[in-house]
Structures are given as C-alpha cells and as structure tokens.
Amino acid sequence: MPESTTPAYITSLIRHFEDLRDGTHGGSVSRRDKEAHFEKAVQMLAPVARQVLTEMNMSLLLGSAQLTETGLRRTADGGLNASWALSWPEQRAAGVELIVLQAYFGGSFHHPHLRGTTVHDWPLNVFSDEDAAAQLSILRAIASSDLHNLVYRADYRIVPAVTASSGTQLANGAKTT
C-alpha cells in the first residue's frame, strides 16, 4: 500500500512495531532524546485533544463541561505525561471518572502512548503537526469510548444531549428521537 493512501492508524502501528524492532523511538535511542520527542509531540497534540473534547462538550454535554489540561509533568515513576479532561455536572453527580485524553511516557516504557480513562494504550508517534492532526480520529475514538464506558458505570443520564427534551436539535442539524 503506497504511503499516501495508508491510513494514519496503520502508519502509527507500523512506526510502533518498527520502534520495537529497532529499539528506537522516532530515530532516538536514549531516554533523554525520546523525552524530547515526547515533549514536542504533546505540544503538537494539545490543540487536537482540545478540539476533540470541545466537540464532545458542545454536541453531547450541551456545553456544560469544563475542559482542563495539565501540561507536561513528571510522574512518580520518572516518566512524563500530559492530559486533557472534561468534567460536567451529571458526571460528578454520578461519581464516575472524567473523560480524559492522556499522552504518557512511563518511566520504564520504550516509547509513549495515548490513553483515555477507560481505554488504554495506543502508540503515540507524533513527530510533526501533520502526525498530530492525523491523531484526530484516534482521539475521537478514545474519548467516545470513554464516554460509552462511563455511561455503563453510571447510566445514560450523564449525557445531557440524551436527557434533553425529545427532538432536541443536535449540532449537525439532526434531531434526537
């Protein structure tokens, strides 16, 4: 399959498997260089993560959520992480976790990953703005899966778009039933 027609998720998996094969990440061998790649990846990924969570907030949570982000920080195991999270009234009342998109590079990890609150471990291979933008569908899938799993931990009432009056117009012009 030519590179130009290869879907982003396949490219990401190929990079991941090649890194495992070669003992590298983005061409880097040392932890220090890999962390430098990770720091840049977080900077490029931040606007994409914010876009995904803003879409969910506006379309599903009816603008009721608060978006927070941590920025890059060192973890207890010596790794690095950054996260973007949505919290909203129904989620807090139900006592379930936030929807979280997290980029993390565990202290003993060979390379970094993406994860959600309930969805874990997708290879993070971002080395350009284009790579970051290509993660949009993956971040959407992680955030959507998190919300789906959180509904099962609580119930559908944590999603304001579902509890709004029947026939509510959604952002895309469709109506709920």
Question: What are these language model-derived features?
Answer:
Residues 1-33:
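N-terminal, Lys/Arg- and Ser/Thr-rich interaction peptides
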Residues 3, 7, 12-15, 81-138:
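Intrinsically disordered, low-complexity regulatory segments enriched in Ser/Thr/Pro
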Residues 11-14, 18, 39-42, 136-140, ...:
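Generic detector of well-ordered alpha-helical segments enriched in charged/polar residues
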Residues 17-20, 24, 52, 60, ...:
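Short, flexible helical or helix-coil boundary motifs
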Residues 25-83, 172-176:
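Negatively charged, low-complexity tracts enriched in Asp/Glu with abundant Ser/Thr
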Residues 70, 77-78, 94, 105-106, ...:
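Feature targets compositionally biased, intrinsically disordered low-complexity regions
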Residues 109-177:
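Ampiphathic alpha-helical segments that act as solvent-exposed interaction surfaces
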